[in-house]
Amino acid sequence: MAAGRLRGLAVAGGGESSESDDDGWEIGYLDRASQKLKGVLPTEEKNETFKKALTTGDISLVQELLNSGISVDSSFRYGWTPLMYAASVSNVELVRVLLDRGANANFDKDKQTILITTCSSRGSEEQIVKCVELLLSRNADPNVPCRRLMTPIMYAARDGHPQVVALLVAHGAEVNTQDESGYTALTWAARQGHKNVVLKLLELGADKMLQTKDGNIPSEIAKRYKHLEIFSLLSLSLNPLKGKLQQQTKEETICKLLATDSDKEKDHIFSSYTAFGDLEVFLHGLGLEHMTDLLKERDITLRHLLTMRKDEFTKNGITSRDQQKILAALKELDVEEIKFGELPEVAKLEISGDEFLNFLLKLNKQCGHLITAVENIITELPVNSHKIVLEWASPQSFTSVCEELVSNVEDLSEEVCKLKDLIKKLQNERENDPTHMPLVEEVSTWNSRMLKRTAITVCGFGFLLFICKLTFLRK
């Protein structure tokens, strides 16, 4: 009878899991009419039916079989449990049912844990996040490694899941753990070219200077695999958020990480931890506050926003008008390049006064740009040394360069003073030179002044003559 119920199965071979292809599962379709248990089945047939119900994701049949006495931690071929399989296909509801029935969230087969299986599954990131959260809520250990010493966070980073990475860290996952090859989660993300994961790991305190056993750091790995944008990011980026999470309790981090809808029927949406204080200030200054929710939803940080290309702006739903504002702001931050080759050749004797004045004005403008650049650097540098993320060289090298800069500025000041004194000297000599010919403008001014005086004198004599004549006639 039971065998007849199973004849309706059309079985197609297939395997699951990341680390193991020998899980013994067959993927097939189970006819709904054959899913109802009409009698007591032998244990072997129950197990087979249980496997098929798990394969098709039939929650009701799984619950019936569990009610009939099948162990929730049944061991199938090659030692896989029902929860291990449900996690490998990111079936959220099936994982929930099995955990509610008491399935062991810390089960492992040859050091392949259920959490590792979930993080390396082929489901969507949304499904994986929900499954991982369920497992962590049942005290699954996020730091248990597989045989290759890879932890769940490494698998999540390797497969490009920044929200999963943040969720694991919020529950105590070690960010800088290394596998048997010396790879960290950041190294895996750099190797696979997952920019969003790299940015997230940097925020969470990942050390980008840890070397693999071959002596390579993440930026070098990114360059080797031709992920040049990530190479530049890891080579140049500062990380002011490093260590922020380590200073918080686990509960505080989880509160910032998880924003759960009060209605559990609405897909149990979880949002990953983000630190948007600097981003919100930047957007507010540009009048783009309306973009805050959009960027939060897409887990975009300020550093990510400032390194976006035009196609990434469009892909993330940023309008052309908003793009123009952001790009204009970035352009204003750039200091104008100093091009002294464009300045006039002041050494030529035939240079005009206007050209020389133009030279001085340009020189003054370039000095202003240099002052602005230094002011910007002073503003951006962290006040406290513990906020510096990059491995800096000895401070003595920086101070020595600054001392040279101060010396050069003093030399420049001295030379400008010499130039000013020279100009004053030339001006005085010119005024005292008897052979000096006045400029055309000066001659014209003197002639017009004399003409005015003559005209006034003639008018005065004429008026006086008129008065005298008038007086004589009256007499």
UniProtKB/Swiss-Prot annotation:
Cite the InterPro entries for this sequence. Answer: Ankyrin_rpt, Ankyrin_rpt-contain_sf, Asz1_SAM, SAM, SAM/pointed_sf
Query: Alphabetically, which GO biological process terms does the record hold?
Result: cell differentiation; male meiotic nuclear division; regulatory ncRNA-mediated gene silencing; spermatogenesis; transposable element silencing
One GO cellular component assignment for this chain's record is: pi-body
Entry superkingdom: Eukaryota
ANK repeat placement: 45-74, 78-107, 110-144, 148-177, 181-210, 214-243
Record key words, sorted: ANK repeat, Cytoplasm, Developmental protein, Differentiation, Meiosis, Phosphoprotein, Repeat, RNA-mediated gene silencing, Spermatogenesis
All copies of domain SAM, residue ranges: 272-334
What are the Low complexity biased-composition ranges?
1-10
Q: Which residues form a coiled coil?
A: none
Cell location: Cytoplasm
Mostly located where? Answer: cytoplasm
Phosphoserine carried by residues: 17-18, 20
Concerning Pfam families, the annotation shows:
Ank, Ank_2, SAM_2
Q: Where is this region: Disordered?
A: 1-24
Assembly notes: Interacts with DDX4, PIWIL1, RANBP9 and TDRD1.
Physiological role: Plays a central role during spermatogenesis by repressing transposable elements and preventing their mobilization, which is essential for the germline integrity. Acts via the piRNA metabolic process, which mediates the repression of transposable elements during meiosis by forming complexes composed of piRNAs and Piwi proteins and governs the methylation and subsequent repression of transposons. Its association with pi-bodies suggests a participation in the primary piRNAs metabolic process.
Q: Output this protein's name.
A: Ankyrin repeat, SAM and basic leucine zipper domain-containing protein 1
Organism of origin is Carollia perspicillata
